[in-house]
């Protein structure tokens, strides 16, 4: 059998790199797609046009180190966590918890963490009846004044409508007050 070592130089440095691919073309020169994983976060760096193998290794290491040093993976919300309560009109309950059905993470600059804003948008109160998992609001994620994500907010449970007499009283109350 023929044994051939891996040509990715980052695998042999003590930085934790675990892949991906080296290359060489006469036109593009040396290239490297590299990958590293730390604390559940994976960074991938791709570079080409390097004149030498050593510059390919050095610049790829710099790029991965820059990413690890200057960026964080921030948990915006977990799918099993209620985000907010939304007011319910004419329901047997006054409000309902809302949640997102997926975990939300964003990669942001460490120095700008305070620029990450999360808001709930809905036209409320929401009128009953409400079904479980019905979309009733939107979660907006803004980073550095740019919208980076919108997610459906779903009701955590079913809310039934109050009976006719209660609806009538609440409606009259609303009109008077």
Where are each of the predicted segments found?
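Domain-terminus/edge residues, biased toward the C-terminal soluble/receptor-binding domains
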Residues: 1-177
């Amino acid at each position: 059998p023929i044994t051939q070592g891996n040509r990715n130089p980052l695998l042999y440095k003590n930085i934790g790199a675990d892949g991906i691919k080296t290359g060489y073309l006469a036109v593009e020169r040396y290239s490297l797609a590299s990958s590293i994983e730390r604390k559940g976060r994976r960074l991938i760096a791709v570079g080409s046009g390097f004149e030498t193998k050593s510059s390919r290794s050095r610049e790829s290491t710099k790029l991965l180190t820059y990413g690890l040093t200057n960026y964080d993976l921030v948990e915006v919300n977990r799918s099993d966590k209620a985000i907010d309560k939304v007011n319910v009109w004419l329901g047997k309950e006054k409000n309902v918890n809302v949640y997102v059905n997926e975990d939300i993470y964003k990669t942001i600059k460490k120095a700008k963490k305070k620029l990450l804003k999360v808001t709930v948008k809905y036209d409320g109160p929401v009128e009953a009846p409400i079904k479980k998992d019905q979309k009733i609001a939107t979660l907006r994620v803004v980073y550095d004044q740019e919208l980076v994500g919108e997610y459906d907010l779903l009701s955590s449970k079913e809310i039934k409508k109050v009976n006719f007499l209660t609806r009538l009283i609440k409606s009259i109350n609303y009109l008077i007050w």
